[in-house]
Amino acid sequence: LTIKELTELVAKVVGYTGSTRTLFEQQNQKVCYDLLQDKIVAKEPLSIELICAVHRALTEGTYDERRYIVNGERPGEFKKHDYVTGKNEVGSPPDEVENDLAELIEEVNAIGAKAPLKAGAYLHARFENIHPFADGNGRVGRTLLNYWLMINDYPPTIVYEEDRRAYYDALQAYDEQEDLTPLVQFLEAQTVKTWSRSTEGKKPTPHKKLNSFCCDA
């Protein structure tokens, strides 16, 4: 089914008129989580196969008709055409993607747990710079970043909506100047923010004092 066909089907059956791509993406997040659970526990290192599996899980059913039908692109496969992105037009040519990605994986895996956050920042910035797939590079890149952090005993982080501008600026600093510092600093701040927010509302409710039981009715 194409996105258009599924949209029409869902609208007829349940009256849903929102974005079908959003439905796919939400379901795909769960599929990807299920895919990675055991790999995180086993601390499976990054590989071309793992990256393609993550991309397939996250983008199944989300390619638009131009990419899927006209350009012959497929989830889980490297791009067949150029899809430059950003004002600096980053992105490896299709015939260089696999070699560039293999080199990145080798670099990052060699670092291991020595500097997980800096290595994770480099992984993410360089992955987005390579732009290996026709679509979904941002989702895959952020998933791989957190996968890398977790297999190296570092907490995952969330890029919050209100911080997206700073996030894109940090990636742009790498694209323009190969300056990784802004992204490292951004991830440090987001890690603190993620875990601060995750513990909000989890403080125990104060127990009732004796006086509350002894008051006259």
Place the predicted regions along the sequence by residue.
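FIC/Doc superfamily catalytic core
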Residues: 1-135, 139-217
